[in-house]
Amino acid sequence: MKKNGCLLLFAYSLLSFSLTAATIDETYDESLFIKSFSSRYSYVSFAFEIGASTDSTHSSVFSESSFSLFPLSIARVMDECQVSELHIRATRGRWDYENWKESPDNGFYSGGLGFEVWAFMANDPSMKYWLKLTNQLSGLLCASLNYIDSSNTYQPQLSYPGSFSFSNNTQYFASLPQEDVCTENLSPLFKLLPCKRKAGIASLLDSHLFFDTDWHSFSIDVYPSENQSLASVKMGIIIQAVVDVERNGRRKGKTTFQPPSEYCHDEDMDSLHCLMSGYSTEHHTVDDLFHKVPKERCLLSSTFSDVFVSNGDKIDTFSLDEAANIQIPIQSTSDNHTVTVDRSLSNDGNHWGSLSSTIYNPSSSPRTIVYFEKFPWFVRVYLHTLTITLNGTRINTKDFIEKLYYQPLRDRKAGTMMEIQFSIPPHTNLIVHFNVEKTPLRLDEYPPDANRGYNLPPAIISVFDENNTKLCSLRTAALLMFIPTPDFSMPYNVIIFTSTVIALTFGGIFNLLTRRFVPQQSKFQNRQPSMLQRLKEKIFHKKRG
């Protein structure tokens, strides 16, 4: 009877939990986009999107634990750190605007050199939850995000509007341009996917080939899909790369060389100039890019058309089962820049420097530009030296700048942040110029290999149209700044030389100070004289007497 009562109580508890627990609806989609830039370079983009929503409108979906597709580790981090929106960018390489033209997806899913993290969270003026978030992400992504602190954290006001507005939210932004992107960062991404790398388009990714590309980037975006509510959220993971097909063929070991038929029949032609790679110059295949064909499609994905191939002005759609037979046509990239940006740094000795950014608007419409600069605390920006030149003519900055947010540095506590909003006329070349001062560091503040220089984070250019719609987000190249650095080898040489002299002299001096000198006795001194010696002594003694 007692046993039956316990079973009834257990069944009642399960029924009560099932009635009170919130229902979670989850979705998962994945797709692969391929576009050929030339006979040598192709762009690939792996997109994964996971959605989760709960029927409870008063609670956050991050507080739930019964997920099937949405990664529980991300949900726990978002819930514990009170984050409503999270964005992570990791990039290595330089996007070649001259040959590859416009950045992919208008630059919305690719960052600058190194790591970039920005988040919207509950009112957190003391950065308590922000630092907790970066430390947890550091362990989750196997990256050195724990080096983010108040000295490299900024609060932009214009560059990064949130997906939806939340009251009393605080936005933080940080970048680590010196952080490398490696296989240790890519492997945790696969663990966030429902099918990992066992099925679907993720089975095409090979870490060694991915990091051998000329440019690669990945992004993580967690954001709400409804205004003022975290009951429905989405997480997007995008992995991008520009693949060098010729180098990929050499790595695979199957590239053969044959003489072109146009001019190599001439016997006087140098044979080295007649070598041509054996890969096709008319189209690429999936095997050329990844050295493998995909496995079976991920059964958890709701889409059947998983591969999209750019073919001129149209997009061809294929299922993953047809990937082995897909031919990617080689096409020339069109020159359709919204805005072009170039940034340079001049070093005027070891103490002063100047920075110039050139922005060109090739379109026939004016563009609104938000220019976002950030510097470490040891680079002092002098705002009174800010000048703007329009088509070679220097203009009044007060009349030209529409909005300006400036965060001055605090010595060894916070860096400098500057956001400038202005409108650039059509077909106009604009130059933003200002001076900086390099602050000497203490001896223990120099990083390893200090003579290499220090990476300055890239500037971020946000472009808006007349209706205040964001068109694209551009990153400039990271700059290398040299600051006064002592000769660390001189103390090392002095220490080695001094230690050698001390070692050579210490042994002799220590021997003289500790040894006691005793005169050596003759080995015949204590021996008894023989009978013959005693007889001789007596004879000589009598003669002398």
UniProtKB/Swiss-Prot annotation:
InterPro entries: PIG-T. The keyword Disulfide bond applies. It comes from the Eukaryota. Residues 515-545 are cytoplasmic. Pathway: Glycolipid biosynthesis; glycosylphosphatidylinositol-anchor biosynthesis. Glycans are attached at N168, N227, N336, N391, N467. It is found in: Endoplasmic reticulum membrane. GO terms for cellular component: endoplasmic reticulum; GPI-anchor transamidase complex. The disulfide bond between PIGK/GPI8 and PIGT is important for normal enzyme activity. One of its GO terms (biological process) is GPI anchor biosynthetic process. Residues 23-493 are lumenal. It is a single-pass type I membrane protein. Residues 1-22 form the signal peptide. The chain crosses the membrane at residues 494-514. Keywords: Disulfide bond, Endoplasmic reticulum, Glycoprotein, GPI-anchor biosynthesis, Membrane, Signal, Transmembrane, Transmembrane helix. It holds the Pfam family Gpi16. Belongs to the PIGT family. Forms a complex with PIG-S homolog, PIG-U homolog and GPI8. Component of the GPI transamidase complex. Involved in transfer of GPI to proteins. This is GPI transamidase component PIG-T homolog. It comes from Schizosaccharomyces pombe (strain 972 / ATCC 24843) (Fission yeast).
